[in-house]
UniProtKB/Swiss-Prot annotation:
It holds the Pfam family AdoHcyase. One of its GO terms (cellular component) is cytosol. The keyword Cytoplasm applies. This is Adenosylhomocysteinase.
C-alpha cells in the first residue's frame, strides 16, 4: 500500500489491512472487555451524562484490541473519534478492522512504511463536513508534534529543511506535501485543539520541554505519571509483555542466559523481574545513582554497556534515551546475541549504523544483522517496541488502568479545559485512587476501611485521598 496514492477525499474513510478480519477482532474485543473493568464501569457511570458529546478526538495510540475497548468507551460517552497507530509495527489488524466495521475511521495496519505512518497521522485530523478535531489523545507525542511543527513550518520552511534521520525524512516530506496543497493546513487545525492527554514517558518529556520553552499551545494532561499508569502499565505490563515478545520472536530459552536491561525505571524494573523470573542472570545499566542503587539492592549486577557488550546473550533497552546501544556495542556482541527495545521510539539502538551491513530477514520483525566477520546479531522489531512489534503488548487488565486514566483525563480537559493554562497537569490523587478502586473486585481484592478515629489519627478523609501528592508508591 502506498500512502502517496491514498485519497483523503475517498468515500472509504479508513485504511486497514483487511476489513474481513472484523469478526475475529470483535470476538477478542468481547473477551478483552471482561478484563477491563475500569473502562466498563466508567461507561456505566458516565453514559447518561454524555460528557464527551461534541468532542472530536484525534487518537494516535497503538491500535490493539485493548485500544479498541478504549475507543468504544470514548464513543459511548459521546465522542467522535478518528484513529491511527503510534508505531508502524504495533497494530493488530483484526482490532483495526473491528473498530472500522463499528463505524470509527482507523488508519493503521501492521508493517506500515514511515511515509504511510505520517500520512495516517495526518488523516486523523481530516474530519468530514468541514469539522476539525478539538482533542488529541496521544502516545509518544507524534500527533501533537505534527500540528505544532507543521504550524511552525508554515512560517519558516527551514525547520523542515534538514532531517537528521529516516523518521524526520518521512515526516518533513509529509509536511511539505500538505503545505503545498494548503499553506495553513496545520495552524487551522491547531487553533481548534482544546488540549491533549499523553500516554507515555517519551511524549510527556516532549510536553514538559515545550512548556519550559513557552511553546505549548494548549493544556496537556500527563497520564503517564498517574500512579495507576506508571506503576502498573510500565512495571507490571512490561513484566509480562517483554518476554512474550522475545519468546514469540526467537523461541529462545531465557533460563541460564545473561540478560542486560538498560535503564531501571518502572519499565526496566518490570523487565528485570520477568527475565530473572524465567531464570536469567540479569545485569542492569544505569546513569542515575538512585536507580543504580535500587537495582543493586534487588540483587542485580550494575555494569556498563561497554562491560556487558561482549558477555551477555540478551539486551533490552528501556531508557527513553538515544543510542544507548551503539555501533561499537553491537560490534562487540557475541554471535546470535538478541537485541531489542521496549522504549517508545527506535532511537535507543543505533540501528542506522548497521544498515551498512547485510541484513537477513528471518520473519516479520526478526532480522539477522551480519557483520563482516560473519557474526550475526538478532535484532527484534528493527529496534522499535518489541512487546508490540513481536507480540500483542500488555495484557488487557493492566491496560484498563491506563485507559481509564485516559478517559477521565479526556473528560476533564474537554469539559473544564477553559480552567487550565497552557501547562502540563496530572490527574488529582482522588481520581488515581478511583481508578485503582475500580479494578479491585475483578481480582478478588477486599479493601479495608478506616474508622473515624483512625482517619482522624492519621489526618486523612475516610474516603481518601490517603496519600499526599509527593508520596512515592
Amino acid at each position: 500500500m502506498n500512502a502517496a496514492v491514498i485519497d483523503s477525499n475517498s468515500a472509504q474513510d479508513y485504511v486497514v489491512a483487511d476489513i474481513a478480519l472484523a469478526g475475529w477482532g470483535r470476538k477478542e474485543l468481547n473477551i478483552a472487555e471482561t478484563e477491563m473493568p475500569g473502562l466498563v464501569q466508567i461507561r456505566d457511570e458516565y453514559k447518561a451524562q454524555q460528557p464527551l458529546k461534541g468532542a472530536r478526538i484525534a487518537g494516535s495510540l497503538h491500535m490493539t484490541i485493548q485500544t479498541g475497548v478504549l475507543i468504544e468507551t470514548l464513543k459511548a460517552l459521546g465522542a467522535d473519534v478518528r484513529w491511527a497507530s503510534c508505531n508502524i509495527f504495533s497494530t493488530q489488524d483484526h482490532a483495526a478492522a473491528a473498530i472500522v466495521e463499528a463505524g470509527t475511521p482507523v488508519f493503521a495496519f501492521k508493517g506500515e512504511s514511515l511515509d504511510e505512518y505520517w500520512e495516517f497521522s495526518h488523516r486523523i485530523f481530516e474530519w468530514p463536513n468541514g469539522e476539525f478535531a478539538n482533542m488529541i489523545l496521544d502516545d509518544g507525542g507524534d500527533a501533537t508534534l505534527l500540528l505544532i511543527l507543521g504550524s511552525k513550518a508554515e512560517k519558516d520552511r527551514s525547520v523542515i529543511a534538514k532531517p537528521t534521520n529516516e523518521e524526520e525524512v518521512a515526516l518533513f516530506k509529509s509536511i511539505e506535501r500538505h503545505l503545498e496543497i494548503d499553506g495553513s493546513w496545520y495552524s487551522k487545525r491547531l487553533a481548534h485543539i482544546k488540549g491533549v492527554t499523553e500516554e507515555t514517558t517519551t511524549g510527556v518529556h516532549r510536553l514538559y520541554q515545550m512548556e519550559k520553552d513557552g511553546r505549548l499551545p494548549f493544556p496537556a494532561f500527563n497520564v503517564n505519571d498517574s500512579v495507576t499508569k506508571s506503576k502498573f502499565d510500565n512495571l507490571y505490563g512490561c513484566r509480562e509483555s517483554l518476554v512474550d515478545g522475545i519468546k514469540r520472536a526467537t523461541d529462545v530459552m531465557i533460563a541460564g542466559k545473561i540478560a542486560v536491561v538498560a535503564g531501571y525505571g518502572d519499565v526496566g524494573k518490570g523487565c528485570a523481574q520477568s527475565l530473572r523470573g524465567l531464570g536469567a542472570t540479569v545485569w542492569v545499566t544505569e546513569i542515575d545513582p538512585i536507580c543504580a542503587l535500587q537495582a543493586a539492592m534487588e540483587g542485580y549486577r550494575v555494569v556498563t554497556m561497554e562491560y556487558a557488550a561482549d558477555k551477555a546473550d540478551i539486551f533490552v533497552t528501556a531508557t527513553g534515551n538515544y543510542h544507548v546501544i551503539n555501533h561499537d556495542h553491537m560490534k562487540a556482541m557475541r554471535h546470535n546475541a538478541i537485541v531489542c527495545n521496549i522504549g517508545h521510539f527506535d532511537s535507543e539502538i543505533d540501528v542506522a549504523s548497521t544498515r551498512q551491513y547485510q541484513w537477513e530477514n528471518i520473519k516479520p520483525q526478526v532480522d539477522h544483522i551480519i557483520f563482516p566477520d560473519g557474526k550475526r546479531v538478532i535484532l527484534l522489531a528493527e529496534g522499535r517496541l518489541v512487546n508490540l512489534g513481536c507480540a500483542t503488548g500488555h495484557p488487557s487488565f493492566v491496560m484498563s488502568n491506563s485507559f481509564t486514566n485516559q478517559t477521565l483525563a479526556q473528560i476533564e480537559l474537554f469539559t473544564r479545559g477553559g480552567e487550565y493554562a497552557n501547562k502540563v497537569y496530572v490527574l488529582p490523587k482522588h481520581l488515581d485512587e478511583k481508578v485503582a478502586r475500580l479494578h479491585l473486585a475483578r481480582i478478588g481484592a477486599q479493601l479495608s476501611e478506616l474508622s473515624d478515629d483512625q482517619a482522624a489519627y492519621i489526618g486523612v478523609p475516610k474516603a481518601g485521598p490517603f496519600k499526599p501528592d509527593h508520596y512515592r508508591y
